[in-house]
Structure formats: C-alpha cells, structure tokens
Amino acid sequence: MRHLDVDGLGAVSRVGLGTWQFGSREWGYGDAYASGEAKAIVRRARELGVTLFDTAEVYGFGRSERILGEALGEERAEVVVATKVFPVAPFPPVVRNRLAGSARRLELDRLPLYQVHQPNPVVPDTVTMPGMRQLLDAGRIGAVGVSNYSLARWQAADAALGRPVVSNQVHFSLAAPSALDDLVPFAEREGRMVMAYSPLAQGLLGGRYGVDDRPGGVRAANPLFGTENLRRAEPLLGVLREVAAAHGVAAAQIALAWLVSLPRVVVIPGASSVAQVEANAAAADIDLRPDEQAALTAAARAFRPVSAVRTLVERVRERLPV
C-alpha cells in the first residue's frame, strides 16, 4: 500500500474505504450487511494497509459512524477516520455539538479529519470555519477538510480558517475528471489532498454495465446509465479494458490506479464484499506506464455525458409505446 503524507494526519493510504453504504438501506445491503460483512470489510482493509476511512454524520443518520467505530475496535485511534459535518446553521456552538455526536458514535476522543460536507450556498465560510478553528486549536481534531468545494471556495475556506484546509473530497473519476483542471494542480502546489469519491462512477468503470445490462436500485437513476451516455462511454471503457488486459487486472482496478497515479490524490471507494476491498487495495500498487496514463486521461477528457434532463427525456421516450 502506498501512502501520502498530509499535514496534521501523517501517512494516509492512497486507497481508503468509503462507508456511506454502512447503515444506508437505499443501497440494498440491509441490516445483515451492517452487522456482519461491513465489519469483515473493515478488518480486511486494515490487514491490507488501508488507513483512511471516510464517513459522515448523515450517512445512515449516524449508523455509518457507529458501525465503523465498532468495526475498527481498538485500532480506531491508529487510523485516519474522516467524518463530515453537514453545514446547517454551522455556528461555532453547533459545530462543536455535532463534533461531539460524531466522536461519541465513532468512540473517539479526537477525530483526525473533520470535513465540511458541502458548501453552504447562503452561509459563507467566515461563519463555518471559526468553529472548526476552535476544535483544531483545542486538539479535538487533527485537521480540517472540505467536500464538494470549488477551488475558489476552497481558498476562501483557507482564509476563513487561518490555517490550511488540508483536503477537498470531490466527485472525481475517469468519467468525471474536472478536478484535473484546477483542484489537483492546487493540491500538488500547496501540499494538500484531493479525496476522490465515487471513483468507479457507481460501477460504470468496472466495465460490467452496458445498454443491455444496466444496474438496478439507487444507481438506476444515475444519468450515466442512460442509453446515450452508455454509448458515449464506450470509447473510454474500451481504453480502460485495453489497459486492464495489458496488466492482467480488472478494469475497475485500472480506474483506481489512474487516480492514485495523480499527484496528491487518494481514493475512497466503497466495498460490498471482502473480495472487493481486496481488489481495491491492490490497485494502489499498479504502475501505469506514461503512455497508458496519457491514453486514459485523453479518453476521460473526451467523454462528454449528456445532461440529466436529456437522460430523463430519453427514458420517458423509451417507455412510451411504439
């Protein structure tokens, strides 16, 4: 497992584990998964050298944090647990209380990374960050991060905190590569960390799905799985399969390897099984050749998915009688 050194956090594994599905019924995993498989996944992740575990107070209404804390057991203080505060009325007393709730569920006295879950469209970071700074100065958290922030908003958060905001967790994959344009260069220049969530585009980059084989459940509503977008994704998926075949690994592993080959980027894929977390962790050690990296990047930039509105119209038309 490869690592990234981050101020306030130390060594962070380049492949982490996202736990949004822990305790979330909409993913269809259910209570049996939460009480059994989820804990086995966390234990195996630790055995494989994973040190970064991401969660949030809103995932499963706190159940994700609770399940993760229990699964980590005595090792919970030895890893980088990253959780998030949802910025509703994010005044300092509220932020302190929300941190206390997360810490209690995770069974931690000190949280390594505390993130603002998304930018509040009305309340500026000059309101949110004083509470985060108080927690930082008091030693209740190791570092401050943000999520879903533009570069300009990330820099504004820096100024409001008066200290570096060490990370920005964003939607980032071969199917959504916009972070390449500004967030990754900023992170490289300033020594920050970009955390890529949904790095496999909800399974699209695994190469399993196509026009005649689409996912069910909550992913069925994702515009990426519309007919036109699946057609447009084929050139990207073709390059992905070609590189995967050259390395003798799965397409999903190449999609992760491309991300972790980028400067200052870590990935936090979820896992529905122990086998999946093993495959994800192995991706950290895949060395892509420069020409393979370039081909994947070019294919990612060339992918232009149609909008959610167009996909909705397309789906309505597909259901109309001919």
Predicted features along the sequence, with ranges:
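N-terminal binding-site loop/beta-alpha segment at the start of enzyme catalytic domains
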Residues: M1-V79
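Acidic (Asp/Glu)-rich catalytic clusters
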Residues: D7, G69-A77, A100-L108, L136, ...
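Short, well-ordered coil/turn segments that N-cap beta-strands
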Residues: L9-V15, G49-L52, R76-V79, L108-P112, ...
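Conserved beta-strand positions
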Residues: L17, T55, T83, L113-V116, ...
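Active-site mouth loops of central-metabolism enzymes
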Residues: G23-G36, K84-P93, H117-V123
